[in-house]
């Protein structure tokens, strides 16, 4: 008896909460569900399109900037809390 979550064809979705930092514009919608198999680069590209800016700094939990090749599910499993992965973004460097 297989459940949907154990099926290889099902992809776990991760809630990504995007939070503006510094003078960055606030998005109208701040929470998104994306497939966990996606790379973090997809989140970065999405933010660049939404903000119409190439200058973008992203941080997980206001602490560190992950490698764009990291999978979203790995970041969520290690740094997510309250059922979501918090990603802070800024147009200029916010944290060293």
From Swiss-Prot:
<keyword id="KW-0653">Protein transport</keyword>
<keyword id="KW-0813">Transport</keyword>
<feature type="modified residue" description="N-acetylalanine">
    <location>
        <position position="2"/>
    </location>
</feature>
<comment type="similarity">
    <text>Belongs to the ATG12 family.</text>
</comment>
<keyword id="KW-0072">Autophagy</keyword>
<dbReference type="InterPro" id="IPR007242">
    <property type="entry name" value="Atg12"/>
</dbReference>
<keyword id="KW-0963">Cytoplasm</keyword>
<keyword id="KW-0007">Acetylation</keyword>
<comment type="function">
    <text>Ubiquitin-like protein involved in cytoplasm to vacuole transport (Cvt) and autophagy vesicles formation. Conjugation with ATG5 through a ubiquitin-like conjugating system involving also ATG7 as an E1-like activating enzyme and ATG10 as an E2-like conjugating enzyme, is essential for its function. ATG12/ATG5 conjugate has an essential role in plant nutrient recycling.</text>
</comment>
<dbReference type="Pfam" id="PF04110">
    <property type="entry name" value="APG12"/>
</dbReference>
<dbReference type="GO" id="GO:0015031">
    <property type="term" value="P:protein transport"/>
</dbReference>
<dbReference type="GO" id="GO:0006914">
    <property type="term" value="P:autophagy"/>
</dbReference>
<protein>
    <recommendedName>
        <fullName>Ubiquitin-like protein ATG12A</fullName>
    </recommendedName>
</protein>
<dbReference type="GO" id="GO:0005737">
    <property type="term" value="C:cytoplasm"/>
</dbReference>
<dbReference type="GO" id="GO:0000045">
    <property type="term" value="P:autophagosome assembly"/>
</dbReference>
<feature type="cross-link" description="Glycyl lysine isopeptide (Gly-Lys) (interchain with K-128 in ATG5)">
    <location>
        <position position="96"/>
    </location>
</feature>
<keyword id="KW-1017">Isopeptide bond</keyword>
<keyword id="KW-0833">Ubl conjugation pathway</keyword>
<dbReference type="InterPro" id="IPR029071">
    <property type="entry name" value="Ubiquitin-like_domsf"/>
</dbReference>
